[in-house]
């Protein structure tokens, strides 16, 4: 048998043996979600996170940046916006059922993630994977055709997370984590990627039962919606809130008449 034929058989076996369990039905598992900004997690995965929280899963949200640049308000400062975005993310997670203690802030500046030291960034996130040993990782799809056109933090978060997932399982990557911190290698059993293209989506979570929860969590990010994005105010006018919620509900993705969140499910090396 030629080596390349053997390789194909191994890849096929990996695909057949490593099919992920239904994400939304998992119970008592450890879930890690990596997001470039506070709000990408809510907008893309809020319904799924609410279902996972209801099922008593341990959910850890890793946020690469503090999102301290996204305001048109001329009186806003980066320091103030970072504090606002932190409070908004904590409120969104509370609505979804995730305690604020489970939010891990890496504290990079908005738009600057791509200019961080790549080795240090991979080492940092590899250490988190080894520490929390997730059964599932959710992250931006690194294989998406349009990932290169995403804003800088999205590109870097997608690629860095998948690099960390791969490094985490091999003990010779960042061996100091094992020697000094007692962090053993960890192979992530299942990965689900969000911000997925329509043609690449192969996994859909029905969020009918939690769509209102997701919308409420999304609207906790007050500073990212008008009018607050132009002139910051900390709360919603009630009439505008209901109007915006209706608009978000109307744009929410549906499949066969059901509200859904779309992912690309991948397992190990065979489908990344």
Model-based region annotation:
Residues 8-9, 94:
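Secreted/luminal cysteine- and crosslink-motif detector
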Residues 2, 8, 18-34, 111, ...:
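Metal-dependent de-N-acetylase/amidase catalytic core
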Residues 18-132:
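Active-site rim/loop-helix segments in enzyme catalytic domains that contact anionic ligands
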